[in-house]
Amino acid sequence: NSYFMLYDEQLVLTGEIDDVGNPKRTNSGSSSRIGLEIENSIKLSDLFSVQTNITLSSNKNKNIFSMVDGALYNYGKTNISFSPSFIGSNSINYKYSENLNFTFLSKYVGKQYMSNTDQPNSILDSYFVNDLSISYLLQPNKIFESISINLLINNLLNKEYISNGYYYTYDDTWSIPGQITTLDGAGYYPQATRNFLAGFIFKF
């Protein structure tokens, strides 16, 4: 699947948040999103199957203007905020038996910016995480027709990574009298290291 979208005054995330943590948006003038999505599913054998999803994209603002040091500045062509150019995911399924199933899940998200001005302080680094899902089906043939036991190990390799955050700018008008200096900053949302989820499904 491919897409080619041109926008006039697209609403994009600024990277900033309001007083209660909601993300702010702004019109970005002319912009575009061009991409290719690839999905693939392969059954290697009666026991193994693989599913892959890849998204390649170019997400650009054509002319971004912003106030810098008290004057309007044209940043020109920049990356749209929170829009990585590469996202890939993969799942490997192993059917050990009719009742026991293992699924190894992987996801990669490329570098992205939290601003629309490509500021170094707004970069979110790429990350790669893996999960493991285990499911076991019991068929007691008594009270329940079946009992499904599910275990999910998130972030199997205990990776420390950041997937989201916020970015802001402010004008320093007090350090040097009569001069405006635009400064910036960022906050980050670290994700959980290895964690576990268990679930049960009872079918009558």
Language-model regions: role of each:
Residues Y3-D8, K24-N116:
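Gram-negative outer-membrane beta-barrel transporters
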Residues Q10-L13, R25, I38, A198-K203:
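Extracellular/periplasmic, surface-exposed regions of secreted and cell-surface proteins
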Residues N1, N27, N53, N130, ...:
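Asparagine-centered polar/low-complexity signal
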Residues T78-F204:
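Conserved C-terminal beta-signal and adjacent last beta-strands/turns
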Residues V12-K24, K62-K77, Y166-A186:
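Solvent-exposed loop segments that connect transmembrane elements
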